[in-house]
């Protein structure tokens, strides 16, 4: 699918390889949303709601987040049924039990089962629980993913290598500015002897978006 890139290797010690040409950020059009964001930020700084330094520090905090926080919540839900119920009821409150700040926007957790597979999209822009699973990947923000996932989710999932059987219901959840989603993936078979810390390391960003399943061990 246009906009979805598969890149499975690291760069340290990797053999020479080519990347598709990417436009410089300066070459991208300055959109209305960008202009509005800059205008609002400038106005709030001018009115001393916050300083430019405070804004920069908050952006740095958000940019530093990784899927590890979400992985901790998933792992605890796998081993603690009571916590799982709390997570499915209120993600933000459940995250606070780990001293994890999930932000002010409500987040809803949807559970994958043998009969239901959930996948997350934001059809308007790139709304996403960044404080729990890190920055959204480029493909999540792409027009192709945003438009096609609603119309043909099975085809999109197949392009990620995720085959969903005909008897399994696929539910697509559209994140908005007022409500975000994260997926509770199924626990991999063969992980029964792993402790909670080891389980958390199995959880991936893409599994919490719902485009992939965790591989059995």
Segments from the language model and where they lie:
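Terminal, compositionally biased segments used for targeting/anchoring and flexible tails
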Residues: 2-217
